From Swiss-Prot:
<dbReference type="InterPro" id="IPR002942">
    <property type="entry name" value="S4_RNA-bd"/>
</dbReference>
<dbReference type="GO" id="GO:0003735">
    <property type="term" value="F:structural constituent of ribosome"/>
</dbReference>
<dbReference type="GO" id="GO:0042274">
    <property type="term" value="P:ribosomal small subunit biogenesis"/>
</dbReference>
<comment type="similarity">
    <text>Belongs to the universal ribosomal protein uS4 family.</text>
</comment>
<dbReference type="Pfam" id="PF00163">
    <property type="entry name" value="Ribosomal_S4"/>
</dbReference>
<dbReference type="GO" id="GO:0006412">
    <property type="term" value="P:translation"/>
</dbReference>
<dbReference type="GO" id="GO:0019843">
    <property type="term" value="F:rRNA binding"/>
</dbReference>
<feature type="domain" description="S4 RNA-binding">
    <location>
        <begin position="98"/>
        <end position="161"/>
    </location>
</feature>
<keyword id="KW-0689">Ribosomal protein</keyword>
<dbReference type="Pfam" id="PF01479">
    <property type="entry name" value="S4"/>
</dbReference>
<comment type="function">
    <text>One of the primary rRNA binding proteins, it binds directly to 16S rRNA where it nucleates assembly of the body of the 30S subunit.</text>
</comment>
<dbReference type="GO" id="GO:0015935">
    <property type="term" value="C:small ribosomal subunit"/>
</dbReference>
<keyword id="KW-0687">Ribonucleoprotein</keyword>
<comment type="subunit">
    <text>Part of the 30S ribosomal subunit. Contacts protein S5. The interaction surface between S4 and S5 is involved in control of translational fidelity.</text>
</comment>
<dbReference type="InterPro" id="IPR005709">
    <property type="entry name" value="Ribosomal_uS4_bac-type"/>
</dbReference>
<keyword id="KW-0699">rRNA-binding</keyword>
<dbReference type="InterPro" id="IPR036986">
    <property type="entry name" value="S4_RNA-bd_sf"/>
</dbReference>
Amino acid sequence: MARYRGPVEKIERRLDADLGLKGERRLSGKSALEKRPFAPGQHGQRRAKISEYGLQLREKQKVKFMYGISEKQFRNYFKEAVRREGNTGAILISLIEQRLDNVVFRMGFATTRANARQFTTHGHVLVDGKKVDIPSYLVKPGQKIEIKEKSKSNPQVVRALELTNQTGMVDWVNVDKDKVFGIFTRIPAREEVVIPVEERLIVELYSK
């Protein structure tokens, strides 16, 4: 599946979930989901009853759109989660949380994961002092994530860091806002990752 490039707020309304796709706008209370909390289209206000399969598929779609990953990438993450010992759903979410673009977002260097992905592919991100321009790179505990020196004054980065005063920072990263770098201290437990997803339904979907 190609990456979706249409209006992201329609996706949030269709999936009936705040996926953090609009960044700063969602903090203003002016997002389309808050103004029109129903599906887009002529009959959007009358949501049809969703089948069990539909519910399972919706949870998978939430993860894919939230983290900006393709169907192929998602399947690979799921296969790896199944291979590892433990709760498959929890491992799946933890794996995806290790993506470099997501860690850049979690550290407050970008207002959305899409911006973090773009920033990464354009070569503005260093991992342990070396440029890594692959958004799907899995960050390991203890690794240092830094914005390149000439990009630290980028207005988007500055604004994103300012917004962390309002949104806060997750517990599994340690960030120096002045020097614009952070340490990915550990892989988060599933209960720490606050996202509107029931991964149990995703596991059921792939268990058929």
